[in-house]
Amino acid sequence: MSEVKQCDVVVIGAGHNGLTTGAYLARAGAKVLVVERRHETGGALVTEEFSGFRFNLHATYMMMLDVAPPYKDLGLEADGCVYIRPDVAASILKKDGTAVTLHGDLEKSVESIRRISPRDAERFREIYLEYKQMSDEYLIPATYGKPVGSAQLAGTYMETELGKKILEVSELTPYQICQSWGFETPELGALLLYLICMWGIDPTETNSSYLVPLYFNRMLNATLVRGGSHRLSSTLQKAGILAGMEVMENHEVKRIIMEDGAAVGVEVAPTGTDGPLIRIDAKSIVTSTDPTTTFGTFISEEEMQQRSKLCLNTARNWEWEHSSLFLCHLGLRKKPRFKAEDQDPAVQTAFIRVFGVESPEDVVKHFNEVMEGHLLHDIGHVTFTTDLDPNQAPQETEPGSAVARIEAVVPYAPAQGDWADVAGPYGDRLIAKLAEYMVDFDPADIIRRYQYTPVYIEMKIPQMKRGSFKHGAYVMTQMGYSRPNVQCSSNKTPIKGLYVCGASTFPGGMITFGGGYNAAKTVAQDMGLNIWWTEPDEVIAAREKGLLL
């Protein structure tokens, strides 16, 4: 052991949750050290530059950034993190050269739908307002509060009309919910179901159906980070460092040091090596890693048998996502036009354009095929990040250039072969399919192309096993109060001094800040630190209505 460090709090992992916890606790007066195995912080907030084109390899659609407490609490906008809200949220492209388009503004969406079906327009308004209420009054506030057990939650739901509505939704599959909307325009249902399920939500399972209203609402209000997604993690890190937080990059945790049944520190070494080892003693250890790593690698099986057999079983039986993502990033000399722009000019700037499906049944069929390991149909969506932020392409050297981000839900291990062999041909298929909806696409306009496969996801970020993008499947035993298990979902573990804050903890994955935000408060309370931030008004209001504890 060549070196010993002392601090109040060690945070394992500098993804957005780890940085959030670290920044809050540093401002609360704690001496915080964040340990990150990679050469940069941010986790899934990855932006890499290729020939002047900025490709957001992972997290791109910020569903919750504008409502997440850390954005204001930590002053992220002032430090350079600015989100851009698109006017046109999404379009679904049809084979006949037309489209169905939805806007961030409700009335614009209603008018857009009215041109196709007046009945669907009014039905959409009803659903939108109902789901907005569910999101604003419960689902968003619940993200930044303590989880509630399922039995207690059901009882709480039954005490309010809003709760009853959420309970009704949660008992249906996403596809059944889509059917209940009763749209006579199948493409409208397909677009909404796709936007909900593109995050790996199985349209035929009820495990996470309570999230349908939230995803419906937030995907129509998703934002883009100006300059690239990594700007968000950079400002999070800056907020922490300005408060005294230290970040140790290129170092990986070898083990959590246990003494008398308590976590008292960590042992780290330069990434990819066995030493020299550094011991970091701390009063609290907060880990953003998944349960298999926290309870299966960092702590010995013998120790876990004594401290928590439940956590050991969680590590052994953790279920990873049943699907992953494939991305084909294109740096283009110019942006092509879509055929549907002639019928609906709004398609030109739609944040997300879905292609390859035209009915909810098409969406279900595609997801079923993916779950079985097949890549039979060319289905996905495309975003031109340069529509909102032209500087994500090298405008000085290539005026008018554009970045296209093609994304598809895929199996981790396709039946067609290894991703090393499949990626190129599959990317070709997606590009060719997308070109069917365009007027003037020319492959010669592709200056740079980069494909990001499920295997690459796992290689870049080992915590994302099997191409995971939520740190674990959304199944009943890994949701809500049970994420990662009933002993740890409130961030505190059965091991004294050890806390969890990552995407495998309540409320789950995506860039919500929920795990990191909630953990910061739990640790601050236990350590007697100054809780300098105030609880969001929405959380207080939800509690007063009996929707939260």
UniProtKB/Swiss-Prot annotation:
pH dependence per the UniProt record: Optimum pH is 7.5-8.0.
Q: Name one GO molecular function term.
A: oxidoreductase activity
Stated induction or repression of this protein's expression: By the monoterpene alpha-phellandrene, but not by acetate.
Q: Which domain of life is it from?
A: Bacteria
Q: Which cofactor does it need?
A: FAD
Q: Name one GO cellular component term.
A: cytoplasm
Q: Report the family membership.
A: Belongs to the carotenoid/retinoid oxidoreductase family.
- Provide the assembly information: Heterodimer composed of CtmA and CtmB.
The name on file for this protein is Limonene dehydrogenase subunit B
The organism named in the record is Castellaniella defragrans (strain DSM 12143 / CCUG 39792 / 65Phen)
